[in-house]
Amino acid sequence: MKNMNRYLALVALIISLISCQSEDNPNRYELIPYPNDMEQMSGRFSFDDDTQIFISPECGDEVNEILARFAEQFGKTAGKDLKIAEKGGKNMMIVKIDTTMSQEAYRLNISKKKIEITAATPNGVRYALQTVKQLLPVAIYGESLSADENWSVPCATINDAPRFGYRGMHLDVARHFFTLDEVKRILNVMAVHKLNTLHWHLTDDQGWRVEIKKYPRLTEVGSIRNKTMIRKEWDNYDTTPYGGLYTGRIT
């Protein structure tokens, strides 16, 4: 009985500690893929009508374009105009380049006063923004205004980099038809998950699926076939090993 009482007391203590932690830091960090290193902190950074973006001069045109697209999507869904600032300040998103970091790595510091993104390359900035978007309300991925949402992100320090250089998805349109909008949606989902390669299986013996006006017979002839050719009878087994297999009967 004493052991049981001790066990119940321990369970009660654990539940109490978990409850206290939840009250101190109610933030949720639902990220895919989960970062390599993250320190969760209390508080939130709130986007308001005065929030601006400062892009360090060494970032270059590509990073400016990436931030412009983010600001456009944010304005469409949150109804807040994220203007580009000429210098850093409070309640800002600050983007900097650090060439000592690995190619696709990023560092994200979110405090109550600002969001700092540091990366070595434009791709690192992209992945940092994808993390920010995952921390925002899901409405950020929509097409309509959702001004009533809580447009804020939980405070945290995140250091992240991909484990694999090739992170891809295979899309077979030779056997399965997809519209252009469906392909774009797949690319958007890939971006959310920080994938970097689309293996687009455009053609196969089933047909040619890409119309090229200069070569019309590719689709006139190559887009259809009467049958699938198979070899029904195999002969001349020589039982000789080849490529790890015998050229005899293989089941």
Question: Regions from the language model: what does each represent?
Answer:
Residues 6-8, 67, 101, 175:
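Low-complexity, compositionally biased segments
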Residues 4-8, 92, 99, 227, ...:
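Short linear motifs in intrinsically disordered/low-complexity regions
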Residues 12-17, 35, 71, 222:
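Generic low-complexity, intrinsically disordered sequence content enriched
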Residues 20-167:
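Acidic, contiguous N-terminal accessory segments
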